[in-house]
Amino acid sequence: MRSIINILDLSAGEIDQLIAVADDIMAQPEKYNEVCRHKILATLFFEPSTRTRLSFESAMLSLGGQVIGFSGADSCSAVKGETIADTIEVVNGYADIIAMRHPKEGAPVVASMHTAVPLINAGDGGHFHPTQTLADLLTIHHEKGTFDNLTIGLCGDLKYGRTVHSLIAAMTRYKNVKFVLISPEELRLPQFVIDDYLEGSGLQYEECRSLEEAMPKLDILYMTRIQHERFTDDAEYQRLNGIYVLDKEKMSLAKSDMCVLHPLPRVNEISPEVDSDPRAKYFEQTRCGKFMRMALIMKLLGLIPNEVQPEKAEEPQYIYDKYRCDNRACISVCEPDVRSIFKTFDANGGACRCIYCDKERK
């Protein structure tokens, strides 16, 4: 059963197909309002969400389907100690497709091992958020008409910013893409993202501490909030919160056709005065998310012709039950019954990573 955990679980051709379907839905929504009749989507949201959960629900309802689910760990049996595996085994009998969000990294990987229906990662901690990236890509497609030859600034929380990690992964497929990474040292991009997606694909990138310095270079600015819920030290959060604020003055430094994106919610990192700037596209971005999720649901339920096939990725070697991950945000640490599995691409037994959270074993 196919699951979408990482944006790279979809090939570039499949993403192009989803964009074409999403554009057709936007142009002719009446064609699609019965295609998921008698189908049920389960939204398993163990972490708060506004846009992603409502977007998935609106997507399924607009396709003529039905929705069941919950919107917090305190409203399901997780609060009683039920494991992800058991939750998924139960929901298998109730739904045709699952969208799952969880605060722990790698939780959807565990879920995918137990699901009998297609499962979509709707965000796992500070790890990945592939369907937000689909929304980002449709917005970029509408605004720029291409994914090639773009300079993209990523600003704010790059360490825990799952949307940033997924967007970088997606852009490895395209030509002459450059990233400008704008963050404080404490919130710089995780090493696995640098190694796998930037260095691993040969993408150009530079690290920068100043938003003002970066602005004139950018075709796209992707702002993110500093995520209070990811910090274990409140004093560190208070020190870093508000370090980058996009306002009219900074917008005056940007190209006339630059595009500002944000996965939302925002706190104080984009001044409301920017909302009226025609380059601000973050609310359009949320609208795009619904249509890309509609297209993805249809694809996973076999309602779109399989004219484009997934790419065959290099298979790693797996190491079972030898190591334990030490990442406190990893699902394998939080649920001790989750089997320890590490992966390596080194035949000589070199560096290996947890399959759930991508943390490298030192």
Question: Across the structure, where does each feature detected by a protein language model lie?
Answer:
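Adenosine-phosphate binding glycine-rich loop
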Residues: 257-258, 263-308
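Cys/His-enriched microdomains
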Residues: 320-323, 328, 352-355
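Glycine-rich phosphate/diphosphate-binding loop of Rossmann-like nucleotide-binding domains
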Residues: 46-59, 142-223, 351-360
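Positively charged, low-complexity intrinsically disordered leader regions
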Residues: 1-54, 58
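Rossmann-like adenosine-cofactor binding region
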Residues: 197-274, 279
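Cys/His-rich microdomains that often coordinate metals
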Residues: 329-334, 361
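Phosphate/diphosphate ligand-binding glycine-rich loop within oxidoreductases
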Residues: 34-141, 268-271
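Short linker/helix segments within small regulatory modules
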Residues: 338-352
